């Protein structure tokens, strides 16, 4: 038996990185999955790598309320309901930097996807979990919701702090209705998003590496293993958690040489 047998999950940002890994792992463990992404082609690539019949692709802009509502409705219509929300979609553009340099337009764009997107997925997804008598919501925050950085991405960091706070509030609100809400807080992960940021600036990557106790980036599957636990019934009493999967980054003061 799989750890997610008979569960239905909606995964945003499923076209690559942690979202794709989650779709692959969740379907391997028996779940039915809506693999949603802004780019339909990459979502379809994810579905093609999943067991046949276990997933379908959906094109969605998570900042668009009508599209998010349609995604939830399509998933419930196809698979009979929804049990798990893995709200993973997020952006970190180059023009999100210091508070002194970041434009209002850049700030708003990040907030629309990273904060409003999670809000909309919860707003339109949780009613389906209530219909099932409960379920699990996994909101992807970040270690930057816990730690500050001199190498600022001001809107991204603020958005992840908002996701963390939102997750706590929802966890308390819906606890007695069988819904668990947790904030998955990854450390730096080897994803296209991060590699794109540092691809042309290895010195910037090295500046950060000295703060990682493990000395390396996390692999997407290592983060998604945490999401699998939170999605499964094994975590039935885990609610409102700041679920850090960061290789000890937030525990560190001086790292090994």
Q: For the regions a protein language model found, what residue spans apply to each?
A:
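The beta1-alpha1 cofactor-binding region of Rossmann-like NAD(H)/NADP(H)-dependent oxidoreductases
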Residues: 40-41, 60-70, 104, 221-222
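Short C-terminal tail/terminal secondary-structure segment
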Residues: 96, 228, 239-257
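Residue(s) in the substrate-gating loop at a strand-loop-helix junction
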Residues: 142
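Canonical Rossmann dinucleotide-binding motif of NAD(H)/NADP(H)-dependent dehydrogenases/reductases
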Residues: 3-34
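Alpha-helical segment proximal to the catalytic Tyr-Lys
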Residues: 127, 172-176, 236
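Active-site helix of classical SDR
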Residues: 122, 159, 167
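Substrate-binding pocket helix/loop in short-chain dehydrogenase/reductase
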Residues: 96-99, 103-108, 204, 208
């Amino acid at each position: 038996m799989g750890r997610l047998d008979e569960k239905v999950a909606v995964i945003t940002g499923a076209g690559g990185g942690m979202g794709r890994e989650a779709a692959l792992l969740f379907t391997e463990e028996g779940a039915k999955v809506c693999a949603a992404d802004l780019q339909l082609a990459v979502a379809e690539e994810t579905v093609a790598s999943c067991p046949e019949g276990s997933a379908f692709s959906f094109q969605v802009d998570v900042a668009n309320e009508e599209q998010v509502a349609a995604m939830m409705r399509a998933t419930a219509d196809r698979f009979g309901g929804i049990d798990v929300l893995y709200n993973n979609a997020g952006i970190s553009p180059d023009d999100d930097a210091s508070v002194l340099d970041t434009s209002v337009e850049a700030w708003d764009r990040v907030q629309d996807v990273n904060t409003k997107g999670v809000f909309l997925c919860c707003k339109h997804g949780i009613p389906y979990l209530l219909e099932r008598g409960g379920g699990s919501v996994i909101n992807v925050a970040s270690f930057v919701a816990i730690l500050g950085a001199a190498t600022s991405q001001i809107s991204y960091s603020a958005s992840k702090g908002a996701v963390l706070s939102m997750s706590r509030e929802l966890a308390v609100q819906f606890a007695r209705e069988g819904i668990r809400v947790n904030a998955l807080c990854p450390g730096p992960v080897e994803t296209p998003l991060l590699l794109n940021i540092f691809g042309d600036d290895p010195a910037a990557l090295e500046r950060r590496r000295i703060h990682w106790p493990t000395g390396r980036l996390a692999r997407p599957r290592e983060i998604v293993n945490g999401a699998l636990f939170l999605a499964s019934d094994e975590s039935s009493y885990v609610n409102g958690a700041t679920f850090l999967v960061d290789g000890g980054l937030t525990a560190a003061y001086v790292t090994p040489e």
